[in-house]
Amino acid sequence: MGRKFFVGGNWKCNGTVEQVEAIVQTLNAGQIVSPDVVEVVVSPPYVFLPIVKAKLRPEIQVAAQNCWVKKGGAFTGEVSAEMLANLGVPWVILGHSERRSLLGESSEFVGEKVAYALAQGLKVIACVGETLEQREAGSTMEVVAEQTKAIAGKIKDWSNGVVAYEPVWAIGTGKVATPAQAQEVHANLRDWLKTNVSPEVAESTRIIYGGSVTGASCKELAAQADVDGFLVGGASLKPEFIDIINAAAVKSA
C-alpha cells in the first residue's frame, strides 16, 4: 500500500474566534478530494482547539502545535500530551523551527517530546530542517540527519509519525525550495531512514514538505516521488488551502 498524501495546516499564533469560525466555514464548504486520497489535519492555537474540533467537517482532523515533554504538573504555561488525548485531539506538531530557534528547543529535547507524545497515543508531525547558513555551507543533510537521529534513537514504532522537512530559510519568507531541491532532501532523508532505521520504516513513513507552500507551488511539489504532502503555514489560513489539499490528486492521477 502506498503512502497516503498528508496535508497539515499550521495556523501558528493567529486568529480570533470570529476568524477561526470563518476558516472552518470555508473548509466545511470546500470541495476536497476523497479521504481515501488525502489525510488532512489543521492545527489552530490551543485555545481554539475545542471550537475547531466541534465545528469542522469530520474528515479533517485537528492537531496541537506543541505539547510538554512529560506528564503534567508544576509546568506553568505548558499543555501535556495526556490533556490533548483527553480532549480527543489526535495529532501534535513537535520540533517546529520557530520553537527550536525562538525557544531554544534542542534536537534531544524534541526527540524526548516525540517519544513521550507517541507513548500517550498521540500521532506526531515531527519537524526537521536547516537554516540558510547551513544550506549555503553545504550541511543540509548533516543537519537534517542529526535532527532525525535524535528522534529515531528514542522511538521504535514509526506508524503514528509523519516527518516534516521544513527548510527554515523558506518559512514565512516567500522563498520556496524548488521541487528538485525538496525531492533531493526528501530522497536523502528516506535513504537515511532505510540505512539507520529500517527499509520498512523508510518505505512507509510520510515525509512532507513545509516551506511557504502555496496554491501556485503545490502541484509541482506534489508530483515529486518522495514528497508525501505538505505542512502549510500562512496559506492554511486562506481559501487556497483547499487547492493545496487537492494537489493530492496529482499522486493518484
From Swiss-Prot:
GO BP, one annotated term: gluconeogenesis
Main location: cytoplasm
Keywords associated with the record: Cytoplasm, Gluconeogenesis, Glycolysis, Isomerase
Domain of life: Eukaryota
One Pfam family of this chain: TIM
Catalytic residues of the enzyme: 96 (electrophile), 166 (proton acceptor)
Catalytic activity reported: D-glyceraldehyde 3-phosphate = dihydroxyacetone phosphate
Cytoplasm in keyword set: yes
Pathway in which this enzyme or protein is active: Carbohydrate biosynthesis; gluconeogenesis; Carbohydrate degradation; glycolysis; D-glyceraldehyde 3-phosphate from glycerone phosphate: step 1/1
Further remark: In plants, there are two types of TPIS, cytosolic and plastid.
Name listed for the protein in its UniProt record: Triosephosphate isomerase, cytosolic
Species annotation: Hordeum vulgare
